Amino acid sequence: MKTFTAALLVGTALAAVPQQQPLQTQVEDSAWAKPLEDLKDTIKSMGAEAKQAWDQLASAFPDALNEYTLFSAPKKHTRRPDSHWDHVVRGADVQGIWVDGVDGQKHREVDGKLENYDLRVKAVDPSKLGIDPGVKQFSGYLDDNENDKHLFYWFFESRNDPKNDPVVLWLNGGPGCSSLTGLFFELGPASIDKNLKVIHNPYSWNSNASVIFLDQPVNVGFSYSGSSVSDTIAAGKDVYALLTLFFKQFPQYAKQDFHIAGESYAGHYIPAFASEILSHKNRNINLKSVLIGNGLTDPLTQYPHYRPMACGEGGYPAVLDESSCRSMDNALPRCQSMIESCYSSESAWVCVPASIYCNNAMIGPYQRTGQNVYDVRTKCEDGSLCYTGLNYITQWLNQKPVMEALGAEVESYDSCNMDINRNFLFHGDWMKPYHRLVPGLIEKLPVLIYAGDADFICNWLGNKAWTETLEWSGRAEFASAEMKNLTIVDNKSKGKNIGQVKSHGNFTFMRLFGGGHMVPLDQPEASLEFFNRWLGGEWKA
C-alpha cells in the first residue's frame, strides 16, 4: 500500500469514453458504516464477479484492509464561546426570511436546508500576524450543529478595489488537505520561510480579487468534527451553507462576481460544489465561473496518460525505463475495465478495487523512483508530500499566537489528514465520474481547466484529453480548436510566452509551461496573469 500513499495526499492523483450520463444519486453502501470485521463478512457474501475483484485485491495487497481505517478520529478541540466572535449568523434566521416574488407569491429569500448551520466570524488583525497589513481579513467557522461539523475559513479582501473586485473561493485537494497550503505555499498573500518568517507575495491572487480559503472537508486543517465526511457530494452541502451565510453577513461581497477555483482533487469537488450552488434558484451566491487546476476529474480518460507522461512523451525526459513503461501498458486494459465498471455502478464495492489497482499499477512505478509526483523535474525533498516548505507552514500555524489570532479551536494543525484521504478512497469517491457534471456547468457559466505541464499526478496530457472527449454541445468545435500561444500582455514581461490555450464557447483549456502540480508555486507571474485575465472575462462564450 505504501506504493501509492503519497499520491493520495496532496494530489490524486486516450480511452474510449462511453456515453456520459448525469452523476447518479449517491449509492447507499450501508456496509461502509459497519466495523471492519462486518465489512469483510460483507465481501464474502458478494456476487462472484465482485468477490473475485476483492479477492484479487487482497491477494495483491494483503495489508490493505488491515492498514486502512474507514473513519477519522475526531481532532482534539475546545470550542470558543459565542462572545469570542464579532458576528454569529444563525442559519435558522436566514432560512426564516421570506420575500415577495415577481409573481406576487412569497418565497424564501435563499433556498437550502440551513436551519442547523451557524457562521462565526471574527476580524483578523493583520498586524499580529504580519500578513498583508492594511488588507481587511476575517476568519471563523461554519458550524453544522446537527452533525457536529465545524469548517474553518480565512478571508482576505482584494488589495486593489474590494468594493468592485470579484470574490473567489479557493480549494486545495487531497482529498484531506488544508487550503491554507494554497494560501502560504502557492497563491495567498504570504509565504513562510525556513526561519518561520512571513514573506510578502507580490503575485498573490488577492491582488485583484477577494479570496476565501476553506479547510474542507471536516477534520482537515483547522476544521474539526465528531463525525466524518467521505464523499464529495456530502461536502458540497456544507460549502453551499458556508457561502450563503457568509454573503448574508457581508452583503457588500455578495454583489460582486463569485468564482470557485481549486486544484487536484478539486477536480472532483468543484463540479459537485458548483452544481449544488446552481441547483438553488433563490440564492445569494453570484457564481460566474469555475477554475480547476491540475485536477482529477475523469479518471477513465486521464489514467491512460500516466504512462506517456512518465515515459518521456509529455515534454520532459522519461522518468521510467522501458520495462516499467511496458508494465504500465500491460496493466492499463484491466485498469480501464475496472474504472468503466465503477462508472456504471458508482458503488464503493466496484470503485474501491479500481482505485487501488489502478493507483498501484499506473502511479506506483513512478513513485518507486523517488521522483516528485508533483513535478517530473525534481526528486522528493521530504516525506510523502515532497516539499520541505510545507513543514514550515505547519510549524508557523501551530504557534499559539497564530492560532489565537485566527480563533482556531483545534489543538494542532496538520497540512493533510490521511484518515480523510482513506475515507474518500474506501467509499469509492476517487474513481467516480464527476466530469459528467461539467456539461451542465458549461451551459450556464465559463469553465477553465488549466494544467502545469511538469506535473505527473494530474498531468496536462490527461487533462487535455478529457476536455476534448467530454460530451457537450460544443465538443467537436472544442476538440478541433487550435492550441494558441498564451503570452503576458500587460507588465514588464509583456510578450513572454507562458503556455498554450484553446477555447470554444464556455469551455477553455490551458497548458502552463514550467508549472508543476501547483502552478502558482512554480510560475507565480504566469498564474496571476491568466487568473486576472480569466476573471476579466477574456475567455467565455
UniProtKB/Swiss-Prot annotation:
<feature type="glycosylation site" description="N-linked (GlcNAc...) asparagine">
    <location>
        <position position="208"/>
    </location>
</feature>
<feature type="disulfide bond">
    <location>
        <begin position="335"/>
        <end position="358"/>
    </location>
</feature>
<dbReference type="InterPro" id="IPR018202">
    <property type="entry name" value="Ser_caboxypep_ser_AS"/>
</dbReference>
<dbReference type="Pfam" id="PF00450">
    <property type="entry name" value="Peptidase_S10"/>
</dbReference>
<feature type="glycosylation site" description="N-linked (GlcNAc...) asparagine">
    <location>
        <position position="491"/>
    </location>
</feature>
<keyword id="KW-1015">Disulfide bond</keyword>
<keyword id="KW-0121">Carboxypeptidase</keyword>
<keyword id="KW-0732">Signal</keyword>
<dbReference type="GO" id="GO:0006508">
    <property type="term" value="P:proteolysis"/>
</dbReference>
<keyword id="KW-0378">Hydrolase</keyword>
<comment type="similarity">
    <text>Belongs to the peptidase S10 family.</text>
</comment>
<feature type="glycosylation site" description="N-linked (GlcNAc...) asparagine">
    <location>
        <position position="506"/>
    </location>
</feature>
<dbReference type="InterPro" id="IPR008442">
    <property type="entry name" value="Propeptide_carboxypepY"/>
</dbReference>
<dbReference type="GO" id="GO:0000324">
    <property type="term" value="C:fungal-type vacuole"/>
</dbReference>
<feature type="disulfide bond">
    <location>
        <begin position="311"/>
        <end position="325"/>
    </location>
</feature>
<dbReference type="GO" id="GO:0004185">
    <property type="term" value="F:serine-type carboxypeptidase activity"/>
</dbReference>
<protein>
    <recommendedName>
        <fullName>Carboxypeptidase Y homolog A</fullName>
        <ecNumber>3.4.16.5</ecNumber>
    </recommendedName>
</protein>
<feature type="glycosylation site" description="N-linked (GlcNAc...) asparagine">
    <location>
        <position position="485"/>
    </location>
</feature>
<dbReference type="InterPro" id="IPR029058">
    <property type="entry name" value="AB_hydrolase_fold"/>
</dbReference>
<feature type="active site">
    <location>
        <position position="264"/>
    </location>
</feature>
<keyword id="KW-0926">Vacuole</keyword>
<feature type="active site">
    <location>
        <position position="455"/>
    </location>
</feature>
<feature type="disulfide bond">
    <location>
        <begin position="380"/>
        <end position="386"/>
    </location>
</feature>
<dbReference type="InterPro" id="IPR001563">
    <property type="entry name" value="Peptidase_S10"/>
</dbReference>
<dbReference type="Pfam" id="PF05388">
    <property type="entry name" value="Carbpep_Y_N"/>
</dbReference>
<keyword id="KW-0325">Glycoprotein</keyword>
<feature type="active site">
    <location>
        <position position="517"/>
    </location>
</feature>
<comment type="function">
    <text>Vacuolar carboxypeptidase involved in degradation of small peptides. Digests preferentially peptides containing an aliphatic or hydrophobic residue in P1' position, as well as methionine, leucine or phenylalanine in P1 position of ester substrate.</text>
</comment>
<feature type="disulfide bond">
    <location>
        <begin position="177"/>
        <end position="416"/>
    </location>
</feature>
<feature type="propeptide">
    <location>
        <begin position="18"/>
        <end position="122"/>
    </location>
</feature>
<feature type="disulfide bond">
    <location>
        <begin position="342"/>
        <end position="351"/>
    </location>
</feature>
<keyword id="KW-0865">Zymogen</keyword>
<keyword id="KW-0645">Protease</keyword>
<feature type="signal peptide">
    <location>
        <begin position="1"/>
        <end position="17"/>
    </location>
</feature>
